[in-house]
Swiss-Prot record:
Record annotation: effect of changing T700A: Abolished O-GlcNAcylation in response to glucose sufficiency, leading to decreased mTORC1 activation
GO cellular component: cytoplasm; cytoplasmic stress granule; cytosol; dendrite; lysosomal membrane; lysosome; neuronal cell body; nucleoplasm
UniProt KW keywords: Acetylation, Cytoplasm, Glycoprotein, Host-virus interaction, Isopeptide bond, Lysosome, Membrane, Phosphoprotein, Repeat, Ubl conjugation, WD repeat
Effect of K932R: Decreased ubiquitination
Coiled coil: none
InterPro entries: ARM-like, ARM-type_fold, HEAT, Raptor, Raptor_N, WD40/YVTN_repeat-like_dom_sf, WD40_repeat_dom_sf, WD40_rpt
Name of protein: Regulatory-associated protein of mTOR
Any GO BP: cellular response to amino acid stimulus
Biased composition (Polar residues): 851-866
Organism: Homo sapiens
Amino acid sequence: MESEMLQSPLLGLGEEDEADLTDWNLPLAFMKKRHCEKIEGSKSLAQSWRMKDRMKTVSVALVLCLNVGVDPPDVVKTTPCARLECWIDPLSMGPQKALETIGANLQKQYENWQPRARYKQSLDPTVDEVKKLCTSLRRNAKEERVLFHYNGHGVPRPTVNGEVWVFNKNYTQYIPLSIYDLQTWMGSPSIFVYDCSNAGLIVKSFKQFALQREQELEVAAINPNHPLAQMPLPPSMKNCIQLAACEATELLPMIPDLPADLFTSCLTTPIKIALRWFCMQKCVSLVPGVTLDLIEKIPGRLNDRRTPLGELNWIFTAITDTIAWNVLPRDLFQKLFRQDLLVASLFRNFLLAERIMRSYNCTPVSSPRLPPTYMHAMWQAWDLAVDICLSQLPTIIEEGTAFRHSPFFAEQLTAFQVWLTMGVENRNPPEQLPIVLQVLLSQVHRLRALDLLGRFLDLGPWAVSLALSVGIFPYVLKLLQSSARELRPLLVFIWAKILAVDSSCQADLVKDNGHKYFLSVLADPYMPAEHRTMTAFILAVIVNSYHTGQEACLQGNLIAICLEQLNDPHPLLRQWVAICLGRIWQNFDSARWCGVRDSAHEKLYSLLSDPIPEVRCAAVFALGTFVGNSAERTDHSTTIDHNVAMMLAQLVSDGSPMVRKELVVALSHLVVQYESNFCTVALQFIEEEKNYALPSPATTEGGSLTPVRDSPCTPRLRSVSSYGNIRAVATARSLNKSLQNLSLTEESGGAVAFSPGNLSTSSSASSTLGSPENEEHILSFETIDKMRRASSYSSLNSLIGVSFNSVYTQIWRVLLHLAADPYPEVSDVAMKVLNSIAYKATVNARPQRVLDTSSLTQSAPASPTNKGVHIHQAGGSPPASSTSSSSLTNDVAKQPVSRDLPSGRPGTTGPAGAQYTPHSHQFPRTRKMFDKGPEQTADDADDAAGHKSFISATVQTGFCDWSARYFAQPVMKIPEEHDLESQIRKEREWRFLRNSRVRRQAQQVIQKGITRLDDQIFLNRNPGVPSVVKFHPFTPCIAVADKDSICFWDWEKGEKLDYFHNGNPRYTRVTAMEYLNGQDCSLLLTATDDGAIRVWKNFADLEKNPEMVTAWQGLSDMLPTTRGAGMVVDWEQETGLLMSSGDVRIVRIWDTDREMKVQDIPTGADSCVTSLSCDSHRSLIVAGLGDGSIRVYDRRMALSECRVMTYREHTAWVVKASLQKRPDGHIVSVSVNGDVRIFDPRMPESVNVLQIVKGLTALDIHPQADLIACGSVNQFTAIYNSSGELINNIKYYDGFMGQRVGAISCLAFHPHWPHLAVGSNDYYISVYSVEKRVR
């Protein structure tokens, strides 16, 4: 028993090795990013890193009140005492000379940090001299910053009244100088440095006076009679910065080994004072022999990093920058450390001042106030760097040995690398990021730093934002001037990451000629494709909606470089090269003609059939912008436009909705260019549409829609959220609004009546008569669909490329097909384009006859209009005659019908004139279905000036921006599905173990033998008549389709899990369903008899709403009929191929990975295909047909030879033809006459014939258990074994007092369990199994 328990978890991986490994190896369909994400760009980054108000300190006032030789009365100095001022002993020379020398030295010290500023000294000044100095500097500085340095060592301490001291002319008195006056003279922006005792008092007084000014300004603004109201506004003090040597109650330190102006020394000569202070801390030195005299002999220059002194200065800068970035709030760091070079230097040095002066019980003060930094751990790294440097001094000076560079930067990069390697999610940013920035321009560390920076940026947009905020941008911009080839991949990667997050850097790149760097990289054939892809992306950003960038890259030969790489094997490179081309000639005619000369459009044609949907989409985008220029055109350009349009038209049947949506946008550019031609075509189609009949909803005499009631109950349709939402029908109120807006009257003066074929609302788009604010249309879905079906799809295919003059007609047909697209986002956009032209054509039509077909197609190609389509809503009533040539007049009043309105849905009827309006999908599931609809938000204004062109604004996709998101996301990180510890991976393992258990347990039941299959384990009333039923292979979920909705049931618990509308038009029905990815993340595919295929996810999920993953027109020539086979499909999970057929003469094979049609196999018969079955291992397809024939196709062979066998033994409609999925598997087929025939595909005749009940309506064959179940019109289900022996009949429901089952409408076996689901015309769905004791 113990051994069994130990082995039981392994059973799923041991006994059924092949099946379980298959689960892991099976490809997943429709699970790529384009299916799982909304096709839109990322939210743009708020540019907090870019300094909008970068400043310079242009003027410096150096005010020294020293009065050398005379001590102020309120200061008692120690003996000995600190005497040095600017490293000068004032008593070593005469007082006046000392004062001048100190002033000159202070200026030199400041000039080290800002050599270009204008310096003015004021030595022992009077109040008037200070005023004159300050007002002069402010006047010259204008809006730039001015620095005021005040040394008050020779005057009394500041007063609590807000005064500092200066002198009278004769130096006989100390004269107070009000900080209020100083504020007035200095203005803003300014920075003040106070080096005196009690300096914190000045900071407090400054703030009080600043607040007082603000209050005075507020009073003056309220009261115009206030004296201040008549005066010029005093400057605001908000942009003023203050640095003070100590708190309000503190005195400056007087230790004789320190300079008297310790604060000034820290701010202006930080390395010198830091080294002296370090030597005074006896406990920290590694080498006791280093003296203050030795420090003065450190070789090198501060600005030369290769020397000991320069390296120390570099390390100091990196450490103080790092401390500030890690401690300060981001906005304060930006303001103090990145806005102004001199301010940044002073604040870096202020951090040192805080560290040194606090050790002498003195606390420097700043405004804005900084958090304490003197205990930060990075100071220990500084101490170590100083110690390592000083330890070498004796040997360097005495023996002349070479200086060994500090390991500081290498060690900090290692720490950064450890953070990248060993860190966890949701961590604090790495402390070393500012140090990485410091070493980018160092040749020694550059390569490693760039590599680590790239790895950091790859963590995501947050990392890019951090790097930009620390100031990385100017460094990586400067590096583009480097010619080192080894830097190319790293710089390309870093710039791709930056531009993916903040595309505004395009201007900086072009300004600094950075685009030339990337042009040379893209043109480099030795550069790996991945890096050329990133380069193509970078260049695509540079030229995106930026004319200067377009011109610069055009001159750099970008078009030719891109064209050379259109057929590169790397799909992402093909995609971005195409996007790059599309962007460079977007609204830039010079680039377009350069493309014409290089035959760019013809070279792009090959990408329209690319196996990767994103590449096809990029090619469509590029060709769309190619024809979308609004410059003057010639006959030559018109011919090119027509050729491009006809090539694009072939993509109308592309399997990817992303491609088709981009196609609509591309064609809309053509519509804009040739507006008048399309208006003419639109009028003709509208006129012709009246001649075609279309099944229309029943109407009462009052004109209200009468929905058919399928059921006595009104089930609640579940909310459907999708990238293409199933949209609500517009309400009667919005319809009335559209009638009022048009105010159309016939010439007789009577009101115009509307029909669904003429003016109607539609849920398929969101523009009101060409205005995007409302949901009303000239053309309803039904009108468009009638036009589309009247000009049949096959005729479209035959027309492509036939006549130069019929291009507009053909493109209009293409747009009609796209407006009826099964994917709502595609149809929405196409409806906008069609309605914009229809509105313009009908409202602006003159009272003249519409051109007939011959005159239209024979006319010469008209020149395009010079401007885009400008759709204006009717301002008041148009002329009465304006509708005489359109179909906007009709005698029969009908309510408009939505394309998504389920005709067979249970519903209610409203009062006459009201519209049947399911709003349920727009609200949470708890909302009542027929509650008040969504509020209309349309603007009712009739002012025509308020309506504007909208095609270019609203008819667009987010494809390019969505594609750019790839570069913003981590590319080095292991995908979550491959990470053994990720939640996704663990969920997959659990699902595969569950699958193994289901297969094993089901097989055990089947092996026991099946003697009866009539134990009813589930019975429930479905909301609609079941038409297709499908078991999920591994969960207790069953999908039941009625005409146009899907219901999901848990057959174990007997609960309804979900119910939602499939979205197919009301005259169509669901005829087939398949579970995709059933072994993992299941999707449901539905096929309708108009040839449309839809794929859903999140069904039967209580936490999420169903979403449409994709949809496409699987078969194009099908016309829905009540007696046809509809659409039949068969799904191959192993290959990702979908076989489709039905009321057509072909079997069409779709590759769901490529989202392309890969093969059309002609059936060779005149009847419909009723059943499909395939075997991926043998590449065989078996089709059962309506004429009774069974046809076998080998899809590896040429189309003319691929039909390898035809069996004509059945004489009636084939209900089911099944190809057994094993190497020697037979074909089992059944006709409505009940004859079961078994064929060996290698033999020309059947190998066995069985006879079962006649009059079959539904049939299924169990893939594992050799069971055949058939449903009859005579209200019973019969189950047979493979020998044709009847196992049992099912005629009555359990628990209903023997109620008879209805006529069987559908049935299906479970793929593994011996379970049978049966749907009948009385709405009931039931599941039967073997006896309980066997289960």
